[in-house]
Design a protein with these regions (language model features):
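Cyclic-nucleotide recognition modules
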Residues: 33, 83-147, 151
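Polybasic "coupling" helices that flank or enter modular domains
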Residues: 129-199
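Cyclic nucleotide-binding regulatory module and flanking cytosolic helices
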Residues: 1-48, 97-98
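Glycine- and acidic-residue-biased ligand/ion/polar-headgroup-sensing regions
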Residues: 49, 60-73, 89-90
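A short beta-strand-loop-beta hairpin characteristic of the jelly-roll/cupin
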Residues: 70-82
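Phosphate-/nucleic-acid-contacting segments
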Residues: 174-236
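Short phosphate-coordinating micro-motif centered on Lys-Gly-acidic
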Residues: 52-58
């Protein structure tokens, strides 16, 4: 994994406004507020997998994934690495860090060939001071992510391995996947078999056996550094 190597890239205001529209928080802002946010945005490209925020750093910013994904990576005292399901394209993350000065307990890792948009927490707090009606919308964003985390914790702790694997696919569909234009009804998640095993906190052999079972059921297709999810199975 590379150290924090990044290159700043330029994105047009029209493109940035499209990204802002992916959050109900910014949809509630007037044009003056949007212009202010546009002035605060920075966008970065990462050629290689890169740690962009270290545990013990203070977060104080929100991020939007334009391309690639963001991973939460935790490391135990004995050096064991555990990854949580990644944040995929067209999704915002990090709202709670704008109002919490505690240091991170994990690393944020950008996958290779990722483009990530960043807005400082000071800008978000300034928006909320001007327009307190934004607080409930931000709380809704935080609550949505918290509920997913609690669901994942429940399945890892209480349910069978097969149920855990199935729940992982549901979570990936919500926070990681992108629709496939050339294959309607399917979603794509760019992820390695090694990382899937890490999400499940299982050996690669055990995780692969579970995923092959889901593939036989028609729920997913396993490819090279990716899985495809059949949306017809998500509501079953």
């Amino acid at each position: 994994m590379s150290p924090n190597r990044q290159s700043q890239i330029k994105v047009t205001d029209d493109q940035l406004k499209i990204f802002l529209n992916c959050s109900e928080v910014f949809n509630a802002c007037d044009s003056e507020d949007i212009d202010f946010i546009l002035s605060q945005i920075k966008t970065y490209h990462y050629d290689n997998e890169t740690v962009i925020a270290h545990r013990e750093d203070v977060g104080d910013q929100i991020r939007f994934v334009i391309k690639g994904s963001l991973n939460i990576v935790a490391t135990s005292l004995d050096g064991k690495e555990v990854r949580f399901p990644p944040i995929g394209p067209n999704r915002w993350v990090g709202w709670i860090s704008c109002f919490d000065i505690q240091a991170l307990s994990h690393d944020w890792v950008a996958t290779s060939n990722s483009d990530i948009l960043v807005i400082p927490g000071t800008a978000i707090r300034k928006l909320c001071t001007k327009n307190p009606d934004l607080y409930p919308k931000i709380m809704a964003e935080i609550n949505r992510q918290f509920k997913l985390l609690m669901s994942w914790t429940e399945f890892v702790s209480l349910h069978s391995l097969s149920a855990r694997a199935c729940m992982l696919i549901h979570i990936l569909a919500q926070i990681s996947a992108t629709p496939m234009d050339n294959k309607p009804g399917w979603l794509q998640v760019d992820v390695t078999q090694e990382h899937l095993a890490s999400f499940l906190n299982l050996s690669r052999q055990t995780a692969n056996k579970l995923l092959v079972g889901l593939e036989k059921d028609g729920f997913i297709n396993i490819g090279y550094r990716k899985i495809l999810i059949n949306t017809a199975y998500l509501n079953r």
